């Protein structure tokens, strides 16, 4: 009996000492701060709680630019994350980095996880799909440009809070009334190149670059110095001189000035909705991107923004299985609908859009379907999207040149001509470096 007792004690001790089956860790680098950072952390927590085999570890790596730079360095050093969030302007660069990535379609197939590219919203999935039809990255947080406005400020200025300006001339008139009522920042904009050049072009069915805006080849060249583009930037420059448009900086710097109530109107990401809902102390509204009513074919559709998730090469098979399971979890209609409603990002799948509509969310939150309506319209060769090499550098050039207009140092034509010339130098450089692919 004593021997049996000793044997049992030894067995129990061994069981306690033996490590539990270790979870497979999946590193996810992202660029989401604030409320969106909390959302990302919640997504990982929910997935981790739903099963015990894998553990997704999200890590904030700074801005999209900083995260991409860090990931390139990490890949070269052999310690890249499994998943990297890359903004849409980095798509062509990632596509050219064949050895550094594994197409998401391939990851899902090898893991034996059901994956139907047709289940995703076409305008979103299409942007991240190769010419051969293979989806290259997971369309995680896709947004588009919309018009946000402060309904309380509209009331104070004698404007109808339920009738936002739909055209650029109407924006100028509303801005003048807001200024007259004492508002020091009637209108601003975030992501200037995206909102005022890229989306502006698609919305007016006007070419931004040749080769279908780069979607049909890396030998594309910029064309956004057309008379329509010059007219628009000239109008914004004149609004800046009159104090009707106040430039608040690059990237999403203007977002905070709208949420705080400092600026009354802004063009920016549909994903600003989550921040507004959480932090704004005023009633806000969402409307479509303004357009020029005399331009034939306008409004057309807006282009995609936000980012997708790329799977990095050089990982183990069981780790890729974890990545596939995580993507499958994010694609569940109820999960994707929850994310869309919380953030203002576009619904990931058709099913999540239908679920959101059926729940009455759009009726209860007027304007939240604007981004979807702008994106589901049939696209043209000029409006399908923009996919250019060295796009990050091109956007920086556009920021620099447009800042010269806002400061009154260059005319709109000078600035756009210079932006196109400098941007085309970047495209030529990218083409030379990647001449093996079309």
Language-model-detected regions and their locations in the chain:
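Extracytoplasmic/periplasmic substrate-recognition and gating elements
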Residues: 77, 133, 157, 230, ...
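Extracytoplasmic "Venus flytrap"/periplasmic binding protein-like
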Residues: 46-120, 156-158, 163-166, 257, ...
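A structural signal for short loop-to-beta-strand junctions that line the ligand-binding cleft
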Residues: 73, 81-82, 113-154, 185, ...
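Hinge/lid segment of periplasmic solute-binding proteins
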Residues: 87-146, 172, 198-202, 228, ...
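Extracytoplasmic/periplasmic solute-binding protein
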Residues: 129-140, 145, 155, 169-221, ...
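Short, solvent-exposed loop/beta-turn-alpha elements that line the ligand-binding surface or hinge
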Residues: 105-120, 164, 206-231, 278-279, ...
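Glycine-centered hinge/linker elements that transmit conformational signals in sensory
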Residues: 172-178, 217-248
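Long, aromatic- and glycine/proline-rich binding clefts that accommodate carbohydrate-like moieties
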Residues: 119-120, 341-400, 404, 432-438
């Amino acid at each position: 009996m004593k021997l049996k007792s000793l044997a049992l004690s030894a067995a129990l001790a061994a069981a306690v000492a033996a490590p539990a089956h270790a979870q497979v860790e999946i590193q996810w680098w992202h660029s989401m701060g604030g409320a969106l950072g909390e959302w990302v952390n919640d997504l990982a927590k929910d997935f981790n709680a739903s099963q015990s085999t894998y553990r997704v570890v999200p890590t904030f790596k700074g801005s999209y630019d900083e995260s991409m730079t860090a990931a390139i360095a990490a890949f070269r050093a052999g310690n890249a994350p499994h998943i990297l969030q890359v903004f849409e302007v980095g798509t062509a660069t990632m596509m050219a980095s064949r050895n550094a990535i594994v197409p998401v379609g391939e990851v899902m197939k090898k893991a034996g996880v059901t994956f139907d590219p047709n289940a995703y919203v076409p305008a979103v999935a299409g942007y991240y799909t190769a010419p051969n039809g293979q989806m290259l990255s997971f369309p995680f947080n896709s947004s588009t440009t919309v018009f946000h406005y402060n309904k309380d400020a509209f009331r104070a200025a004698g404007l109808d809070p339920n009738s936002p300006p739909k055209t650029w001339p109407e924006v100028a008139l509303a801005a003048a009334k807001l200024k007259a009522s004492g508002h020091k920042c009637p209108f601003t904009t975030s992501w200037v190149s995206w909102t005022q050049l890229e989306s502006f072009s698609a919305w007016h069915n006007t070419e931004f670059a040749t080769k279908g805006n780069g979607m049909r080849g890396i030998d594309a060249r910029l064309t956004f110095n057309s008379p329509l583009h010059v007219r628009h930037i000239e109008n914004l420059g004149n609004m800046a001189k009159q104090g009707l448009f106040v430039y608040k900086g690059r990237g999403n710097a203007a977002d905070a000035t709208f949420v705080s109530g400092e600026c009354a109107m802004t063009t920016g990401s549909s994903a600003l909705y989550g921040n507004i809902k959480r932090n704004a102390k005023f009633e806000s509204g969402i409307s479509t991107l303004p357009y020029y009513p005399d331009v034939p074919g306008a409004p057309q559709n807006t282009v995609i923004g936000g980012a997708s998730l790329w799977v990095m090469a050089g990982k183990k098979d069981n780790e890729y299985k974890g990545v596939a399971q995580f993507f499958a979890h994010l694609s569940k209609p109820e999960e994707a609908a929850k994310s869309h409603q919380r953030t203002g990002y576009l619904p990931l799948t058709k099913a999540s859009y239908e679920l959101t509509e059926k729940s009455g969310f759009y009726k209860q939150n007027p304007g939240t379907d604007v981004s979807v309506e702008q994106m589901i319209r049939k696209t043209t060769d000029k409006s399908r999207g923009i996919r250019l090499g060295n796009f990050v550098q091109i956007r920086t050039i556009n920021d620099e040149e447009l800042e010269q207009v806002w400061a009154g140092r260059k005319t709109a034509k000078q600035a756009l001509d210079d932006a196109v010339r400098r941007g085309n130098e970047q495209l030529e450089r990218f083409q030379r470096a990647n001449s093996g692919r079309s």
